[in-house]
Regions:
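Accessory, non-ATPase domains that flank or precede helicase/AAA+ motor cores in DNA-metabolism machines
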Residues: 1-222
Length: 222
């Protein structure tokens, strides 16, 4: 519910923070996000005028603790309606009421590295940059400077390789949508596993599937 305040509803079932729910709102039925859960006496719930949640719509929690807390902070810091903040982080398909169940997601892709695509030696500059970057174990913004064709992408691919071997996830951003096919082709040649491409030209269902599979840990390279 994209408004500035929160509303109280009751439920007889266990609900966790960050879950989508369907609730009555005036004469309408809307999608809401559980922001806080409080336990009160069952007798009070039955006799109170608090409206009841119609249904819990998720098989999982949409917003886990780190993201949940970040969105609460963003709403307060930027003085923006808390409902709009949470809504903006949901795929469009989850912002609407639907009778369809959440699509099933296959098991995690098994990523294998194709050595045939990297049968060449790195330059001394590439080796130095890669060695330094591999030592970084936490968030650290780093700029790799080089002219076009100097081999920056290969450094990125070697780093992706390292993270995939460590069972971690990788998010790769490209400056414009026209570069997606080129990067996707490079990644598919290097890794035998599903690569998720998420952009505005996909249908809502396609974007949702990639979002959900990434969210559940089944997609390691996006």
């Amino acid at each position: 519910i994209p408004v500035r305040q929160c509303f109280t509803y009751k439920s007889t079932s266990k609900i966790k923070k960050g879950t989508r729910v369907t609730v009555p709102f005036g004469k309408k039925t809307l999608i809401g996000i559980v922001i806080k859960v409080s336990s009160i006496s069952t007798s009070i719930v039955k006799t109170s005028a608090i409206k009841e949640i119609i249904s819990v719509d998720d098989q999982y929690i949409c917003f886990k603790k780190p993201l949940f807390n970040t969105l609460l902070w963003a709403s307060e810091y930027y003085h923006h309606p808390i409902g709009e903040v949470f809504l903006s982080f949901l795929p469009s398909i989850l912002r609407k009421q639907t009778n369809k169940s959440i699509i099933n997601i296959d098991e995690t892709s098994n990523y294998k590295i194709n050595s045939a695509d990297k049968n060449f030696d790195l330059t001394s500059e590439q080796k130095a940059a890669l060695k330094k970057l591999k030592k970084i174990e936490e968030f650290n913004p780093t700029l790799i400077y080089g002219v076009t064709g100097s081999g920056k992408t290969e450094i990125y691919l070697r780093l992706v390789e390292k993270l995939v071997q460590e069972k971690k996830s990788v998010l790769i951003l490209v400056p414009e949508i026209n570069l997606v096919p080129q990067m996707l082709d490079r990644l598919k040649k290097r890794f035998d596993g599903e690569i998720g491409a998420y952009h505005s030209k996909l249908t809502p269902n396609q974007r949702f599937k990639i979002w959900l599979k990434s969210r559940l840990g089944g997609l390691k390279i996006v």
